[in-house]
Amino acid sequence: FTVDNTAHLLAQLEGGELDFVVLEGIFDKSRYESFLLRNEPYIGICAKDHPFSGCEVPMDELFSERLILREPGSGTRKILERELMQCGYTVEAFRANVCISSFKLIRHLVSEGCGVSFLYEAVVKNDAQFGHFSCPPLTGVHELNVVCLKNTNVPALARRFLDL
């Protein structure tokens, strides 16, 4: 079991180091065998006492904040970048952005009021130190997929494993 960004996980899959991966990011579905594990809310998070907590935030108000985000290659980051791009923006539109590869450190910095972030609800579910906010179209529901190489017996094995 390993946690890493989408690009690294796919490289490990192709290198035979992993049998299957669970991806929350964007990948080439024509290149791999995949099936939907579940749909997961992708949300904005902030410190619990932040003015955004519990609100729907207009995009232009977000840009005055420090954005704390995952490293390039991360599925979580790719989703945010794609949604921003569709609205004509990049992460550079934010007052500042900090790139961190650890969800644990991102959680800590956001809970301390150092900035806002976007990630899957499961990362902070039932944790009272965080406020949640929405900012359509940046937030919404996205797929979590089980991904493996084509033409192997792994899809059936992965399904059985996940049914346990």
Task: Label every PLM stretch briefly.
Residues 32-68, 72:
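Flexible hinge/capping segments at coil-to-helix
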Residues 67-88, 155:
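Secondary-structure junction motif
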Residues 5, 58, 101-102, 120:
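Short loop/turn segments at beta->alpha junctions
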Residues 13-14, 62, 107-113, 146:
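Hydrophobic residues within well-ordered alpha-helices
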Residues 134-164:
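A late-sequence structural motif
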Residues 1-4, 24-25, 91-102:
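Short beta-strand-to-loop elements that line the ligand-binding cleft
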Residues 25-32, 103-133:
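A ligand-binding cleft/hinge motif common to bilobed small-molecule-binding domains
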Residues 1-30:
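Central regulatory/effector-binding core of bacterial HTH transcription factors
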